Regions:
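Solvent-exposed interaction patches of small proteins and small membrane subunits
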Residues: 1-150
Length: 150
C-alpha cells in the first residue's frame, strides 16, 4: 500500500466538505427541481451546483485512488462512493444526460449524510484511526451514480 500524507487526505476531505456546504447553503431555498429551471439565474445556480458535484466526485475519485479504496469504500459503506464518482463522469462527459430532478434529489437527499460522513472521516483520521491508510510520520492535524431516484 502507498504511503499517503494525512495532511493531503484531510485537505482533500475538507475540500469535499466545503463544496458540499456550499451546495447546501446555496440550494436550501429550492423546493423542487423546477426551481433550477425558472430563470437564467436559476440555471446559473444549477450549473454551479453541477460543477460542485463534479469537483466532489473528482476529489472522491482521487482519494479512492490514493488509498486504493482502503479508506472510503472499505470503512464508510453508508455512502455510495462509486455512484458519486459515476455522477462526476456524467457531469464531465455526458452533458445532455444531466437530469435536473436527479441533481435536485442528490443535493437534498445525498449531501447531508455525505457532509456528516466527511466530518467523521476527518475526525477519525486526526484521531489516528486510519494510520494504516495514511503515512503516520505526518501527524499534523493542520496539515468526496450519486443519484437517489427510484
Amino acid at each position: 500500500m502507498r504511503s499517503i500524507s494525512k495532511e493531503k487526505i484531510v485537505g482533500m476531505l475538507h475540500f469535499v466538505e466545503e463544496q458540499s456546504s456550499f451546495i447546501e447553503r446555496t440550494t436550501k431555498h429550492l423546493n423542487s427541481y423546477h426551481d433550477f429551471l425558472i430563470s437564467d439565474s436559476a440555471m446559473v445556480l444549477f450549473n454551479s451546483t453541477c460543477m460542485c458535484l463534479q469537483t466532489i466526485g473528482e476529489t472522491v475519485r482521487q482519494i479512492d485512488n490514493l488509498t486504493e479504496e482502503a479508506l472510503l469504500v472499505e470503512n464508510y459503506k453508508e455512502i455510495p462512493w462509486k455512484r458519486i464518482i459515476g455522477l462526476r463522469n456524467i457531469l464531465s462527459h455526458e452533458y445532455a444526460a444531466i437530469d435536473p430532478e436527479a441533481i435536485f434529489n442528490t443535493i437534498k437527499i445525498g449531501i447531508p449524510p455525505l457532509l456528516a460522513t466527511i466530518n467523521s472521516i476527518i475526525a477519525d483520521i486526526e484521531n489516528g484511526k486510519h494510520n494504516a491508510q495514511c503515512d503516520v510520520s505526518n501527524l499534523s492535524s493542520n496539515s468526496v451514480l450519486f443519484v437517489y431516484v427510484s
